[in-house]
């Protein structure tokens, strides 16, 4: 931003979404909606609506679960919620669309990156395994190794099968 001479035109704030005050022309939220939790998604979208200026746009990057799996998923703790990301929750597109609409926002576009993210996870897993000796020397044991190898493989398979997706979507305040 500074190198491009935009520091007088752009204000970046890294903060908890619940602490936002004022109106913004643009809001970006990158892979944090998963940490909001099922019970707080309505408030998350309400906060975006409240803080987005008229005609303002928000860009969200989120990991989502396929609509056909959502009902089972939302009522049962999965491996990631139990061992990796307690309290995490993947929304589905249908619920996102409902929250967006209920808050007077409009989705402009959805872009899927599931295949790209599957490839990224494969690279991360391979790099993790290549660097295992360095990691082990920091005090991590074989249980940790198996857990993370499984986690990365589990996620890669989820993206490849389209059971989960990495989406970017933009929405606008009507």
Which stretches of residues belong to each language-model region?
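Conserved hydrophobic residues forming the short capping helix/wall of the S-adenosyl-L-methionine
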Residues: 1
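Conserved SAM-binding strand-loop segment of SAM-dependent methyltransferases
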Residues: 4-17
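ATP-dependent adenylate-handling active sites, centered on carboxylate activation for C-N bond formation
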Residues: 6, 22-25, 171
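A short acidic, Gly/Pro-enriched loop at the edge of an enzyme's catalytic core
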Residues: 15-30
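A short His-aromatic
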Residues: 35-36
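A short glycine-rich, Lys/Arg-flanked "PGG" loop and its adjoining helix->strand segment in the class I
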Residues: 42-57
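Alpha/beta-hydrolase-fold catalytic nucleophile elbow
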Residues: 61
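Substrate-binding/catalytic lobe of Class I Rossmann-like enzymes that use SAM or dcSAM, i.e.
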Residues: 64-174
């Amino acid at each position: 931003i500074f190198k491009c001479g935009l520091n007088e035109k752009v204000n970046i704030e890294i903060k908890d979404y619940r602490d936002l005050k004022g109106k913004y022309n643009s809001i970006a939220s990158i892979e944090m909606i998963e940490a909001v939790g099922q019970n707080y998604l309505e408030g998350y979208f309400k906060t975006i609506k409240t803080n987005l200026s008229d005609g303002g746009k928000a860009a969200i990057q989120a990991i989502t679960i396929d609509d056909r799996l959502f009902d089972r998923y939302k009522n049962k703790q999965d491996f990631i919620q139990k061992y990796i990301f307690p309290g995490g929750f993947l929304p589905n597109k249908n619920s996102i669309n409902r929250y967006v609409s209920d808050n007077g926002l409009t989705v402009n576009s959805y872009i899927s990156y599931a295949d790209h993210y599957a490839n990224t996870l494969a690279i991360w897993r391979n790099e993790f395994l290549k660097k295992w000796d360095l990691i082990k020397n920091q005090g991590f044991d074989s249980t940790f190794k198996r857990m993370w190898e499984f986690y990365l493989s589990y996620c890669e398979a989820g993206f490849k099968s389209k059971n989960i997706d990495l989406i970017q979507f933009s929405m606008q305040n009507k």
